[in-house]
Amino acid sequence: MHIASDPRRPIMVILATVSAFAISMAAAAQHRLITQGNDRLAIVDAGGDIEWEMPWRGIHDIHVLPDGHIMVQRGASEVVEIDPETKQVVWSYDSRLQNGNAGKAVEVHAFQPLPPKSAVNPTDDWRLMIAESGTARIIEVDRSGAMLATTPMTVDKPHPHMDTRLVRKIAKDRYLVCHEGDGAVREYVQGTGQVIWDYDVPMKVGEGPDEARDGHGPEAFGNKCFGAIRLPDGDTLIATGNGHSVIKVDPAKKIVWSVTRNELPNIRLAWVTTLELLPNGNYVIGNCHAGPGQPLLVELEPKAKKVVWTFDQFDRFGNSVPNSQILDTPGAIR
């Protein structure tokens, strides 16, 4: 028996394929997150809608506390805690004014809450770590503003705006510091400031010019590293800033993994800023100054370098979104 062919069949197959792809993408993890851009600080739900927001100027670091309060920078040197229900600042510390810094040029680009009795703070006291650029020191303060610890940093090209970018305490007596101006990542011993590991970020990883270029977007080029995290296997993941790449470096300083500017399909990495290691092993990469049509965040399965999620809200947050925090993945390393 002859069965007549259906002229609609090719179209139906295409539609089925597209639908399957759409369902697959919809099934992929969507994330609730907090970020800042276009003078707005906002929590975005997993569906991409604004859940909460308030006016706020630019930041370089952000942390949401267990009680939901938000810690961000205000201006160049102050760290504040915001109650999201009232949208009021309930605590602050200004590095330009406190603990011996009055009259000095100081900027703060990184800070980190240190919960009591944790791997990074074995004491009974809640602490806040603050990296002070200009005075080149890392301090830990309590709620009263009293300084409980201080650690000097080594800076080859001192400048209050470029001494540091993100800094993280990675053990009870260790700090991992991104030095933007020096183009280096250094690990310090708390108190003494001894450098026990360091890595000079290469000017070129993969494609790119052979010398630095000014700017902030895809046209810029250099080794102004922004973020670094220590991975559980002992390697260090580094966001190279205007190097347009992420590199994984082993303790012997060998690059063992990387993703470069145009390596991901339809994605252009610009000023690469933040890094998060999710519990499933995926990396979330901050992609700042990339321009319209490019994601602000990229979640990547590193082994296959497969993009599993992107956050693209350029129209809402603009071209300068330096930091964010994924809020629905407890246990992430950032």
Where does each model-flagged region fall?
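N-terminal secretory signal peptides that target proteins for export/translocation
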Residues: M1-M12
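Intrinsic disorder/low-complexity segments
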Residues: D6-R8, V18-S19, A28
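Histidine-/acidic-rich catalytic cores in large beta-rich domains
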Residues: A29-R334
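Bacterial N-terminal signal peptides
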Residues: M12-S24
